[in-house]
Amino acid sequence: MIKKIAVLTSGGDAPGMNAAIRGVVRSALAAGLEVYGIYEGYYGLYHNKVKQMTRYSVSDIINRGGTFLGSARFPEFKDPAVRAKCAEILRSHGIDALVVIGGDGSYMGAKLLTEEHGFPCVGIPGTIDNDVAGTDYTIGYQTALQTAVEAIDRLRDTSSSHQRISIVEIMGRHCSDLAISAGIAGGCEYIVASEVEFNREELIQQIERSIIKGKRHAIIAITELICDVNELAREIESRVKHETRATILGHIQRGGTPCAFDRILGSRMGVYAVDLLMQGKGGYCVGIQNEQLVHHDIIDAINNMRREFKADWLALSKRLD
């Protein structure tokens, strides 16, 4: 019978994480459980940064971006001895189960605690990249999408004024959901996705044809890590004789007030994670599919499940050019 649970956020922060923490804390307290917050992720767990939460610990945070518990990269968690110490610290506080909010790396940590130490963990997908298997949306994705679209709108204003080609690099690592969605919503003339081999020559030829037809400015949305966008801008400008500039949105996409969707999603997932633990279901991760909350075996989600590439969305963007 679970009496005490803990919650931590790990990896990159995402708008809506605070709503998820709040959902965990308040629903667990309402069920008569004790709740502990672990500050600075797995790093904080290893250094025993554990504090008991009350309902007032999570007051006035639902509208705040980031995570008030903090987060930190902690590659040392790959060491079995480090994980053993973390499990020991959890048990020293009498904690029976753990909720982990984060991306794939955070899930891996929860998976190892479950596998190696029999510690019940539930993962909640929190990352702007929307690259976690087993869910249609991750917490933070919709807010980051809105941020990217607003940036594209602003770039279009200045690009049209100066007849300029603008390249905007959007986060996502190896998942192009953000770039594709922002590109469609922002009316980008070209979208470069990481799931499709980048053909630089083809892109430049497309731009040249557009200029011949009278196009005076353009926006190119590209997922990060595909190429050096500043170097690409220089090459395009040299080839097509049209001023070209690159903008890297970077970490601005992680910040800001979470949108209503992410606040609601985080709240729902936080409560659902507690429900699973109270039912004795540790070793799972939470998701939302077709607007319904679901859960999957966390080991299966990491090892066997893959996110589907939005190829039809990319095809749609080309028809809208």
Curated annotation (Swiss-Prot):
**Its GO CC terms?**
6-phosphofructokinase complex
Which GO terms of the molecular function aspect are on file? 6-phosphofructokinase activity; AMP binding; ATP binding; fructose-6-phosphate binding; identical protein binding; metal ion binding; monosaccharide binding
Similarity comment: Belongs to the phosphofructokinase type A (PFKA) family. ATP-dependent PFK group I subfamily. Prokaryotic clade 'B1' sub-subfamily.
Write down the InterPro entries for this protein, in alphabetical order: ATP_PFK, ATP_PFK_prok-type, PFKA_ATP_prok, Phosphofructokinase_CS, Phosphofructokinase_dom, PKF_sf
* Protein name (record): ATP-dependent 6-phosphofructokinase
Q: How is its activity regulated?
A: Allosterically activated by ADP and other diphosphonucleosides, and allosterically inhibited by phosphoenolpyruvate.
Cofactor field: Mg(2+)
| Subcellular location(s) of the protein | Cytoplasm
Query: Looking at the record's lineage, which domain of life comes first?
Result: Bacteria
What task does this protein carry out?
Catalyzes the phosphorylation of D-fructose 6-phosphate to fructose 1,6-bisphosphate by ATP, the first committing step of glycolysis.
Q: What is its EC number?
A: 2.7.1.11
- Organism expressing this protein natively: Pasteurella multocida (strain Pm70)
* UniProt-annotated binding residues for ATP: 12, 73-74, 103-106
Annotated substrate binding sites: 127-129, 164, 171-173, 224, 245, 251-254
HAMAP family (UniProt xref): Phosphofructokinase_I_B1 (MF_00339)
Annotated NCBIfam families: PFKA_ATP, PRK03202.1
User: Which parts of the sequence bind ADP?
Assistant: 22-26, 55-60, 156, 187-189, 213, 215-217
Pathway(s): Carbohydrate degradation; glycolysis; D-glyceraldehyde 3-phosphate and glycerone phosphate from D-glucose: step 3/4
